[in-house]
């Protein structure tokens, strides 16, 4: 397939085989969009920067951390990003994609069947507030992330209960302020977590500022978290 209009910043991060898989994924997402309103980010920079690059660069940026061969959780996966992007670039990892909307999980299942992923991929239609209190899911992941779901404090309440003691939570944020940093520190203190690292980047093609906050458990998260459905969103810690 042709590489027209794919930003150089992406081409420098992924292999020829991975480019082909991302192009196949783009085609299938467009097919799905003809039947259901899955995402508006399907063409040009909307796809290659806002979806692909934004999903994969954090796992290339923290060079002191090995993100390969891990158990990976994407919370609120939507149309499959960042989870499917991570799957393409980390084929030895086991992937769990969860979303509360059946329309979204049905779409992701279709994509998984259509694309030649090498991973073991699980797609679950449920709320993280429910799954986090199941012994088969809690404290079970090396990496957990969510993108475009909620504020960092709420997202931390979703992520930390799912992580193994040595695991990492990957928080996708826009511009990062001192107030947000203080609020996150307060939340992490309650959840027995800590900030491990942070990186900021200007996305290609003037797509804005992106901050990635890496969080990590200090101890296992108290069992009462996450709270019941809706509480983390309405009343952040």
From Swiss-Prot:
Subcellular location per the Swiss-Prot or TrEMBL entry: Cytoplasm
GO molecular function terms attached to this record: rRNA (guanine-N7-)-methyltransferase activity
Q: Which residues bind S-adenosyl-L-methionine?
A: 76, 81, 128-129, 147
Main location (coarse class)? cytoplasm
**Function per UniProt:** Specifically methylates the N7 position of a guanine in 16S rRNA.
Q: Which organism is it from?
A: Prochlorococcus marinus (strain MIT 9215)
Name the keywords, alphabetized: Cytoplasm, Methyltransferase, rRNA processing, S-adenosyl-L-methionine, Transferase
Q: Does the keyword Calcium apply?
A: no
Protein name stated in the entry? Ribosomal RNA small subunit methyltransferase G
Q: Which InterPro entries match?
A: rRNA_ssu_MeTfrase_G, SAM-dependent_MTases_sf
How is this protein annotated for GO cellular component? cytosol
